[in-house]
Amino acid sequence: MAETSVRNFNINFGPQHPAAHGVLRLVLELDGEVVDRVDPHIGLLHRGTEKLIEAKTYLQAVPYLDRLDYCAPMNQEHAFALAAERLLGIEVPKRGQLIRVLYCEIGRIMSHILNVTTQAMDVGALTPPLWGFVEREKLMVFYERASGSRMHAAYFRPGGVHQDLPRQLVEDIGKWIDPFLKSIDDLDRLLTGNRIFKQRNVDIGIVSLADAWAWGFSGVMVRGSGAAWDLRKSQPYECYSEMDFDIPIGKNGDCYDRYLVRMEEMRQSARIMRQCVDLLLGKESTGPVSNLDGKVVPPKRAAMKRSMEALIHHFKLYTEGYRVPAGEVYAAVEAPKGEFGVYLVSDGTNKPYRCKLRAPGFAHLQAMDFLCRGHLLADVTAVLGSLDIVFGEVDR
């Protein structure tokens, strides 16, 4: 009698799955309940961002970057603004730098609190997301009070930030910090020592440091494996070199360590925010928030009422844009998900010749097969939750 060959069982995970974080589709090959192979299918949210930017002026390109990692929009704008500023050879005034750093850290907390709480939800804890969204809502309001929009802010522009922050807003951000740290401690007590949470995350999805570098990981994925690599310290931009903060690192490189790193990073972000708030209310309470070059930054409304030149500058800036000297530059920021880079090529015209976006989630997703092989089916969601993937930036 001929023996029947046993073949593996294939299932589709997503793109409608609640734990798939957007439009992810994984084709899983299972041997019983053990994962043999993971094949991620991407491109379901592809919008051609890089190509669209080539048809827009440098100022009009900014809103596209909000729509990449939409959990922390301003961090993406930051990389693009830095790249354009390096090509233009302009500096951002100190107050503008502080506002940028403040809002980048707000974005980091927004992203991490969403990730940590939904990671807990993926493994069965329903309370954390409800707590996390309470704090996240307050941060969304700070976004709205600065830029007028809760998510797609378009607030960081090449040359600085769009508008100054009212003093009351800076004071309110300062008042928010201590209650937030208390709620992080509550979350910590709920999850960190929780037996079920630990059983689902400890020793799952282990990445050694050598593997992390080889796969092109960055951000929490590298720090969870024990490397204190953070662009805010290793390649400081804006005024991060003047800020006092620590880089948390993990020991084992598993899902649990990555969770712990994110929890501590939120506390460090709050620490940076407090320093920014103190400076913005004290030494740097007045001054310009963007470069004073009228060719790059629009004039104030009052100046437009008085001066014909200001009106012309404003009109030219929003219709034609400014010409950027020919050249190429790579600017990277430590976004919440990892190293977000913008490689900008200018041919001397008012539009970018090429804008390559280096999304951290892309490198992390490609390792799903490597991370999940040999684990059980239920561990796929735990690994995916700890990678912190957002499809806006993966598919671009």
Curated annotation (Swiss-Prot):
GO CC terms of this entry: plasma membrane
The reaction(s) this protein catalyses: a quinone + NADH + 5 H(+)(in) = a quinol + NAD(+) + 4 H(+)(out)
GO MF assignments: NAD binding; NADH:ubiquinone reductase (non-electrogenic) activity; quinone binding
The keyword Nucleus belongs to this UniProt entry's keyword annotation: no
Broadest EC class assigned to this enzyme: translocase
Record localization: Cell inner membrane
One Pfam entry name: Complex1_49kDa
Keywords, alphabetical: Cell inner membrane, Cell membrane, Membrane, NAD, Quinone, Translocase, Transport, Ubiquinone
EC id: 7.1.1.-
InterPro entries in the record: NADH_Q_OxRdtase_suD, NADH_UbQ_OxRdtase_49kDa_CS, NDH1_su_D/H, NiFe-Hase_large
Keyword Cell membrane: yes
Main location: membrane
Membrane topology listed for this record: Peripheral membrane protein
Subunit structure: NDH-1 is composed of 14 different subunits. Subunits NuoB, C, D, E, F, and G constitute the peripheral sector of the complex.
Similarity remark: Belongs to the complex I 49 kDa subunit family.
Chain's role: NDH-1 shuttles electrons from NADH, via FMN and iron-sulfur (Fe-S) centers, to quinones in the respiratory chain. The immediate electron acceptor for the enzyme in this species is believed to be ubiquinone. Couples the redox reaction to proton translocation (for every two electrons transferred, four hydrogen ions are translocated across the cytoplasmic membrane), and thus conserves the redox energy in a proton gradient.
UniProt xrefs under HAMAP family: NDH1_NuoD (MF_01358)
PANTHER family in the cross-refs: NADH DEHYDROGENASE [UBIQUINONE] IRON-SULFUR PROTEIN 2, MITOCHONDRIAL (PTHR11993:SF10), NADH-UBIQUINONE OXIDOREDUCTASE 49 KDA SUBUNIT (PTHR11993)
Protein name from the UniProt record: NADH-quinone oxidoreductase subunit D
Species, as recorded: Mesorhizobium japonicum (strain LMG 29417 / CECT 9101 / MAFF 303099) (Mesorhizobium loti (strain MAFF 303099))
Gene coding for it: nuoD
